[in-house]
């Protein structure tokens, strides 16, 4: 079911959204919903991305994570280039169905295009002058992005 057909349906009572058993994702003005992917084993947040209706449907149907790239304006399967596929073990939707949480088995160990396990590899701290500084918390790369993506 596409995002257009989901959003074009008749109005739904808030109780149906918050307590019902029917998936009714609330896509934004661009037809996207925010997705948080976590490592099912460790609970680590791996990445935040977006799905359109087709990506959501493919993820549900295949059991592998599909996303919509806002920069490339196209659907993409996680790991289609790197081989680091996300096998979806569980999917959840938040209370008002405008965000999706997927628990995944991250094959190859890297979710980030930089080659790291997680896209959240820097912590925000305050420097001596109080200005924010980024502190690297994960320097280990599971792969060389230049070799994988040919940059």
Curated annotation (Swiss-Prot):
Cofactor binding description: Binds 1 Mg(2+) ion per subunit. Binds 1 zinc ion per subunit.
Physiological role: Catalyzes the hydrolysis of the adenine ring of phosphoribosyl-AMP.
Cofactor section: Mg(2+); Zn(2+)
GO term, biological process aspect, one: L-histidine biosynthetic process
Biochemical pathway: Amino-acid biosynthesis; L-histidine biosynthesis; L-histidine from 5-phospho-alpha-D-ribose 1-diphosphate: step 3/9
Keyword presence, Zinc: yes
Chain sites annotated for binding Mg(2+): 94, 96, 98
Location in or out of the cell: Cytoplasm
Disulfide pattern: none
Gene Ontology molecular-function annotations: magnesium ion binding; phosphoribosyl-AMP cyclohydrolase activity; zinc ion binding
This protein's name: Phosphoribosyl-AMP cyclohydrolase
Keywords: Amino-acid biosynthesis, Cytoplasm, Histidine biosynthesis, Hydrolase, Magnesium, Metal-binding, Zinc
Pfam families membership: PRA-CH
Chief location bin: cytoplasm
Listed EC numbers: 3.5.4.19
Family: Belongs to the PRA-CH family.
Quaternary data: Homodimer.
Enzyme class: hydrolase
GO cellular component: cytoplasm
Catalytic activity field: 1-(5-phospho-beta-D-ribosyl)-5'-AMP + H2O = 1-(5-phospho-beta-D-ribosyl)-5-[(5-phospho-beta-D-ribosylamino)methylideneamino]imidazole-4-carboxamide
Protein residues bound to Zn(2+): 95, 112, 119
């Amino acid at each position: 079911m596409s995002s257009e057909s989901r959003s074009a349906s008749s109005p739904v009572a808030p109780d149906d959204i918050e307590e019902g058993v029917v998936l009714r994702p609330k896509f934004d003005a661009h037809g996207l919903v925010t997705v948080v992917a976590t490592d099912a084993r460790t609970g680590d947040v791996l990445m935040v991305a977006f799905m359109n209706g087709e990506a959501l449907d493919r993820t549900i149907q295949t059991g592998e994570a599909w996303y919509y790239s806002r920069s490339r304006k196209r659907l993409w399967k996680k790991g289609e280039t790197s081989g680091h596929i996300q096998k979806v073990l569980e999917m959840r939707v938040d209370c008002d169905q405008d965000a999706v949480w997927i628990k995944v088995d991250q094959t190859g160990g890297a979710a980030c295009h930089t080659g790291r396990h997680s896209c959240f590899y820097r912590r925000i701290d305050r420097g001596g002058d109080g200005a924010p500084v980024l502190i690297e918390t994960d320097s280990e790369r599971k792969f060389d992005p230049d070799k994988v993506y040919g940059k």
